[in-house]
């Protein structure tokens, strides 16, 4: 069926080649990783520390946006390792090393890790702790003296300290300039590239000139938003001075990344044009990009002509209008607090997440899969396949599409890194290596390949798995490997986890990616409704600031999440993909366009002049009506019911009053969201399939 057809092998190969193209700062980052890995490996081998593969791999997950962030990001895994060892010793000593208690502790810890991965704003910490705990508690399943196991557990902390310290040292030696300046530069690079490309279309440049202008845009599209989001997190974590960054910086990064993507799609399909209207539309886009490059802002000068014709160009115009609809900075320095949200103001738990059924359901699924893998490999007396538990904890995601994406990438990385590179090195290279110099040379080459691949947008996770698999096969012990079984056993463990997770996540408790996108969009709309429901008294209360900070972080995170989930729809192999892809596009557009409504309202509530508007009955009434409509839209999206138009008109605000300008802007923002959602399918194939399956089960 056409709806279920997958991309061809040629298409996948083309995407992989695109993902490996050079992008800004990719080479420098890869070389720093190589240097840190080699330095850490030398220290571990010279000091004869038992753990080698895992601590060396952790260098890949260290933040590299600034030396301070590198130090902070190394303290977390090091601290988690200490906590994991402490909990391990408490469980073993407190229960006299009872095997049943050890097993139950694995189930409880993995459940907590899965639940906190959903409920926490610092999600990576929980799975990391779960993985480290399962690693050290499994040592007690072996017939080894207790003092040896305790020393081995402590060696894990020492090994992590050496390798992560090497990574921090390298980052401090090659420190870069301010993250704020680099973030501004990244915005300027993208705006400049977009202006150049669309200016070429506006003046009917030759095909060669257009292609030359298209290439930088295509490479920036391949880079995605991760680099800019990483720089944003540096500013947040270090509480740096925003230095005039625009309001709503995190959402603007997502909007700009989407603008680059749709512009690259247009440039790839149109390398020449003679249409006068298209040239005029491209000139309008180029002008807006130039204004954004100069000041991050552009007048709300919407395109005055029809957007009919080329759909790719229409998407560019829609995204650009969503950017220009964002609020502009004023001369007030108070706007700095609206640019970035310092990490100290981000709540640890997502509001309402602990009471959500989905949080505990996900924790149960992760716990069931990890515990079952743990039982199987110990019952079979086959500890070499312990990678099954690792796969569950690092690949367990909420949606079937995202999970399949990560599992497929993990399997591909294990085959390439563990079998081809790892097994190939053991067979062909290790017999001829007789010094640490030769080993470091081999590790450096493979590390560079893995680091370069890990910087990709679509397949970056494969690079991480290449490194993890290669290190696990070749650096399993302090001596040179002499057997071929480790590579085989790693794949067996991964295959076992794939089978169990496929059954649990895809067959028993499936959550489709489009369903999560609907839930995320509904959460965004309800957050905006909550903002519109704020009264003047509430806006002046002492607790208002903390409430708004949490809501602001939640909405921004959900909009970014929707864009990431949109890319995972491609991996929904088992369902009718085309309707889901269409619905995903609509949900993404609605989320991006809703950002301007949220941020304009947030600016209104942060200023005394704006709060004074909340005392006017006409404005309060319309805000309440729109808040109810946004709540109703959110409910319609969750239930997949048809979206109904608003059709509300007020009579309390005169046509020529300043308040009318605010209301017109508010109505316009809502109308854009509603217009997009009116095209959202009312019911997808996912629910039909589930309903049919439930009816068959009831009949049985």
Regions found by a protein language model. Give the residues of each.
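Membrane interface segments of multi-pass transport proteins and intramembrane proteases
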Residues: 90, 94-100, 104, 429-437
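Catalytic cores of nucleotide-enabled group-transfer and carboxylate-activating enzymes in metabolic
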Residues: 72-75, 324
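Hydrophobic alpha-helical transmembrane segments corresponding to the first two to three helices
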Residues: 406-410
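Juxtamembrane/interface segments at transmembrane-helix termini
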Residues: 122-125, 172-185, 460, 485, ...
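Long, hydrophobic alpha-helical segments that serve as membrane-spanning/inserting helices
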Residues: 1-34, 38, 46, 67, ...
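Pore- and pathway-forming membrane helices of multi-pass small-molecule/ion transporters and channels
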Residues: 7-15, 31-71, 78-86, 103-170, ...
């Amino acid at each position: 069926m056409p709806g279920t057809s997958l991309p061809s092998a040629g298409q996948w190969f083309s995407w992989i080649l695109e993902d490996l193209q050079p992008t800004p700062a990719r080479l420098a980052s890869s070389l720093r990783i190589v240097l840190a890995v080699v330095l850490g490996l030398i220290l571990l081998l010279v000091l004869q520390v038992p753990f080698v593969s895992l601590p060396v791999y952790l260098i890949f997950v260290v933040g590299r946006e600034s030396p301070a962030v590198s130090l902070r990001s190394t303290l977390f895994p090091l601290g988690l390792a200490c906590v994991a060892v402490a909990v391990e010793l408490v469980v073993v000593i407190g229960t006299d090393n009872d095997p049943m208690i050890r097993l139950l502790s694995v189930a409880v810890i993995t459940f907590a890790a899965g639940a906190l991965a959903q409920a926490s704003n610092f999600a990576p910490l929980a799975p990391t702790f779960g993985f480290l705990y399962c690693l050290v508690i499994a040592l007690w399943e072996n017939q080894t003296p207790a003092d040896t196991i305790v020393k081995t557990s402590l060696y894990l902390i020492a090994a992590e300290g050496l390798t992560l310290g090497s990574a921090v040292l390298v980052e401090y030696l090659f420190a870069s300039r301010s993250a704020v300046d680099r973030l501004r530069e990244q915005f300027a690079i993208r705006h400049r590239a977009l202006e150049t490309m669309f200016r070429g279309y506006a003046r009917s440049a030759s095909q060669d000139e257009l292609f030359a202008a298209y290439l930088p845009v295509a490479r920036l599209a391949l880079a995605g938003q991760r680099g800019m989001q990483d720089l944003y997190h540096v500013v947040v974590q270090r509480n740096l001075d925003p230095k005039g960054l625009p309001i709503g910086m995190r959402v603007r990064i997502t909007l700009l990344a989407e603008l680059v993507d749709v512009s690259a799609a247009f440039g790839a399909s149109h390398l020449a044009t003679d249409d006068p209207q298209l040239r005029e539309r491209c000139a309008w886009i180029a002008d807006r990009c130039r204004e954004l490059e100069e000041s991050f802002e552009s007048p709300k000068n919407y395109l005055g002509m029809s957007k009919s014709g080329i759909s790719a160009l229409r998407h560019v115009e829609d995204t650009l209008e969503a950017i220009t609809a964002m609020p502009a900075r004023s001369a007030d320095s108070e706007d700095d607090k609206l640019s970035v949200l310092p990490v100290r103001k981000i709540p640890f738990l997502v509001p309402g997440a602990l009471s959500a059924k989905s949080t505990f359901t996900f924790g149960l699924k992760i716990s069931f899969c990890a515990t079952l893998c743990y039982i199987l490999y110990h019952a079979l007396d086959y500890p070499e396949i312990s990678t099954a538990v690792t796969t569950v904890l690092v690949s367990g995601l909420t949606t079937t599409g995202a999970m399949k994406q990560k599992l497929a990438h993990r399997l591909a990385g294990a085959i390439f890194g563990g079998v081809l590179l790892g097994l190939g090195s053991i067979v062909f290279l290790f017999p001829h290596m007789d010094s640490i110099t030769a080993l470091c040379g081999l590790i450096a080459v493979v590390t560079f390949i893995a680091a370069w691949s890990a910087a990709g947008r679509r397949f970056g996770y494969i690079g991480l798995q290449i490194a993890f698999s290669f290190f696990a096969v070749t650096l399993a012990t302090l001596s040179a490997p002499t057997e071929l079984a480790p590579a085989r056993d790693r794949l067996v463990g991964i295959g076992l986890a794939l089978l169990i997770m496929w059954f649990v996540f895809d067959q028993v408790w499936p959550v489709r990616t489009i369903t999560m996108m609907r839930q995320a969009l509904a959460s965004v709309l309800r957050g905006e409704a909550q903002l519109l429901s704020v009264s003047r008294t509430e806006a002046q209360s002492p607790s208002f600031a903390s409430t708004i900070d949490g809501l602001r972080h939640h909405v921004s995170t959900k909009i970014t999440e929707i864009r990431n989930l949109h890319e995972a729809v491609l991996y929904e192999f088992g369902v009718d993909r085309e309707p889901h892809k269409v619905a995903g596009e609509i949900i993404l557009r609605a989320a991006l366009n809703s950002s301007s409504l949220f941020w304009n309202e947030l600016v209104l509530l942060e200023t005394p002049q704006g709060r004074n508007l909340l005392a006017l009955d006409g404005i309060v009434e319309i805000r309440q009506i729109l808040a109810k409509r946004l709540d109703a839209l959110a409910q319609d999206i969750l239930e997949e019911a048809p979206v109904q138009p608003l059709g509300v008109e007020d009579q309390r605000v005169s046509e020529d009053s300043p308040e009318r300008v605010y209301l017109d802007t508010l109505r316009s923002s809502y109308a854009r969201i509603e217009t997009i959602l009116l095209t959202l399918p009312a019911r997808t194939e996912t629910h039909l399939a589930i309903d049919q399956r439930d009816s068959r089960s009831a009949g049985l």
